[in-house]
Amino acid sequence: MDHNQYLLTMFFADDDSFFKYLASQDDESSLSDILQITQYLDFLLLLLIQSKNKLEAVGHCYESLSEEYRQLTKFTDSQDFKKLFNKVPIVTDGRVKLNKGYLFDFVISLMRFKKESSLATTAIDPIRYIDPRRDIAFSNVMDILKSNKVNNN
């Protein structure tokens, strides 16, 4: 199995195997692995944005990726918000699981598609949206949540 296939399969799985794997690696290897994943995510994001543009060209506004879309994430309560931004240290004593079913098939297809796509030959500029760590509104909300946690204890 290719190392990138291994990484992406762990990354897309709905468990903490990816975090356990990264925690067991040295910093340089972890950063290199994260860079590989971001390259594939940038490719997926480019595909999504081009698809959104096609929909908007025929008059359908796809709000999830629209420039005018204001809602970044929907939270039903503050606990969901805290879970998103709470970075708990990862315990490395657990086993890393690898899903070799449909998720693995998806990863292989993604890698082949990226390799054979005409988009892969063009330089992909990094495509990013709001970074919650740098956004003042998110920072203020996090400060409020942290102060509430301190006050409640």
From Swiss-Prot:
Membrane-spanning intervals of the chain: none
UniProt-listed InterPro entries: Poxvirus_J1
Record's subunit section: Homodimer. Part of a complex composed of the kinase OPG054, OPG092, OPG114, OPG115, OPG142 and OPG157. Interacts with OPG175.
Family: Belongs to the orthopoxvirus OPG100 family.
GO cellular component: host cell cytoplasm; virion component
Induction: Expressed in the late phase of the viral replicative cycle.
Protein name (database record): Virion assembly protein OPG100
Domain of life, per lineage: Viruses
Key words, A-Z: Host cytoplasm, Late protein, Virion
Task performed by this protein: Late protein which is a part of a large complex required for early virion morphogenesis. This complex participates in the formation of virosomes and the incorporation of virosomal contents into nascent immature virions. Plays a role in DNA packaging during immature virions (IV) formation.
Pfam families named among the record's database cross-references: Pox_J1 (PF03338)
Gene field: OPG100
Lineage summary: Viruses, Varidnaviria, Bamfordvirae, Nucleocytoviricota, Pokkesviricetes
Keyword Thylakoid (UniProt): no
UniProt subcellular location: Virion; Host cytoplasm
